[in-house]
Amino acid sequence: LLSALSAGPVGIGDRIGHTDATIVMRTCDADGGLRHVDRPAALVDDCLFGAPARGERLAWATATATRAGEVWTYVVAINVSTRRVHIHDSLALHDLGLEGPRSVLDWRGGTTIIDDRLSGSLAPRDWAYFVVAPLGRLADDGDLRKYVTMPSDLP
């Protein structure tokens, strides 16, 4: 997932004969072309000074993909606590520069809701992944088998 949100190459590090093709295909189209974002994922400002490592909040990172002039936002939340504690946390879409409620896909859960914040309750080393649609669009548009459901059409 993080490689797919890196806006760069995706390297497969599995041993020969042990690659899970289903996971690899989440990063690319059938022809092998990567489904890329505009820029690499980056932590939100409030996560830059150690709060996730201290177990005070989840590590939230975002990337965007611009397609046909619309901006799709991809958000990953990871529990990186060094104390290995369960963390309940939320992130307002306003903190990402997104105004008002949006259609949000919980990619792992396969559910779509309309909300103005993302929430996660994660065990140590667990992760959540969300797709936030542009205003007026549904987050479950696109290819839901892929990490980048609506890839960028920017060069």
Regions found by a protein language model. Name each.
Residues L1-L138:
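Active-site-proximal substrate-binding groove within the catalytic cores of carbohydrate-active enzymes
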Residues P134-P155:
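Accessory, solvent-exposed terminal regions and/or long lumenal/extracellular loops of proteins
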